[in-house]
Amino acid sequence: MNQEHKIAIIPGSFKPPHKGHYEMIKHYSELVGPDGEVLVFVSKPSAKNQRKTPDGKVISPELVKQILDIYCQSLGNVNVEIAQVSPVKACYDIGERLKSGVLLFGCSKKDDDIKRFNQIKSYIESRNPNLIVLDPITTAVDVTASEDGVVSATDFRRVYGNPEEMMQFLPDHLNDGTKHKVIQMLLQ
């Protein structure tokens, strides 16, 4: 990558945030380097699009932000925000506003994640010729796997309420005390 200021934007629901989310954020943090920045946009879904735990609990965007801040504490170039519009729309908006630099969009190689960004490179470059937009396909991350398969928020929600099973979904770099704190935050 060239020496221009690099910004990675990672939109998503992150409900609940798990080790795969952290590994993706860490990947982009390393990719943009210490002088770059990573903006993580957490969705604020409408009532019909909320993701719920088996017992019907809604995981709030505010809780997601608090947990991602804990996960990313050691990553000095990461800022987690709650998106006021759809997180993908926030990506487009930032791409239009930036004056120059290199822009990356965070996504995984899982399912349809990359498809959210099919048009973004050409769209932003046509409106902002001073910006270099990297093709999301070239920077997409592999999905984090565990012994039981791919780590997903859906599977994390399935074990919600069972602290022992929830532990396997938390980032490996967290100590046990921090993992217990995160689980307590999720279960409150």
Model-derived features with residue positions:
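Nucleotidyltransferase catalytic core that binds NTPs
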Residues: 1-188
